[in-house]
Amino acid sequence: MTATPPPAVTAHRRIQGLDLLRGAAILLVLLRHSWPDLFGGAGIVGVVVFFTLSGYLITGLLADDVRRFGRIRYGRFYRNRFFRLIPALLFVLVGLVVMEGLLDVSDTRRFVPRTIGVALTYTMNIPLFNHGSPNFSHLWTLANEEQFYLVWPLIVFIGVRYRKLRVLVAVTAVVLVVLLVASVAWHRDDIGTIYNHPTTWTISMVVGAAAKLAEPRLDALIGGRRAAPAAAVGAVALTAMALVPDAKDHLVTYLVGGSAVGVSTVLVLWKLKEWTVAPRGVGLLVKLGVISYAVYLWNYPISWWLRDGGAPEVPVTTVVLSIAAGVVSWVVVERPVARLKARLETRASDGPKRPESVSAARS
């Protein structure tokens, strides 16, 4: 999920249009988990929207480091990722210990230690070994993002150092496509096997990163008065893909789905990034976007805990409980940690700023 500073701490840097996009993405995930027959592709679309936005934002943070300091501040980068991602993850793992360790509602008590280990090492997307409780298999998306956070700063650093960042981005995209095609070919008889593999959807993060690096060109191409029509096209495409029945079972989903959702997300993003304050009427979706990370963490296990616990199958109950858990996570864990991080940052000196052009990062 995308790591963004909480609004209560850094409201001057938060763009409500991006929270609106996050809210729409997590809503798609909620719809897919509760009404899979109607929203067959919504989970894929929602997750890949997050991936694309993550690639866009993280590349922006790294490029900003180059512009201001002439280098990537790795310590600060990974510290911020830790403060943003780990507390909410630990909170949902407490839920795992209670529901599956103490109460054993899913008959998975024996898997709890392994699940915690896999979750904290971000290896849920690595195939060919036991990941623990199936109720936490959705953490493959976090694994994808964390692995991206490990590799991408190094690519940006090398690209900036040798003024070949665009070339490296293109090479990375080609390598990912080759790996994806090979994976599809190898698993074509059981294509759903590759759904949560590391290379299946990572191309969308590179699409987001490329969009950030090409921002001036895209501003000229789909900015200004063209932004709204372009966003409408992107939104229609995302909606259509979200309604594809049994999307996980189609070979074409894996071959072009990541790129198609990534490009469509960029079209929508180019309009929404202008909305520092979102229009009236979408406030609830913006608020949902703020807590989207925690809602995602809790939604999938809650859906299974209800079923395994014998609760009546009322899909809307899962949605309501997931949002409630997200609110609790935000109020009890994420917001206090964000405030602590903000206090620590005010005490620390960033060092002398270096007015260096970011053009090197875009070469």
What are these regions (language model features)?
Residues 2-17, 24-46, 58-76, 98-102, ...:
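Alpha-helical transmembrane segments in multi-pass integral membrane proteins
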Residues 75, 79-92, 156:
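Alpha-helical transmembrane segments of multi-pass membrane proteins
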Residues 30, 94, 120, 151, ...:
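Hydrophobic residues within the alpha-helical transmembrane core of Major Facilitator Superfamily
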Residues 88, 92, 168-177, 229-237, ...:
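Hydrophobic alpha-helical membrane-interfacial segments at the cytosolic entry of transmembrane helices
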Residues 84-106, 110:
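Hydrophobic alpha-helical membrane-insertion segments
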Residues 132-157:
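Function-critical hydrophobic alpha-helical transmembrane segments in multi-pass membrane proteins
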Residues 50:
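Structured binding elements
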Residues 112-132:
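Extracytosolic (periplasmic/ER-lumenal) interhelical loops and adjacent juxtamembrane/interface segments
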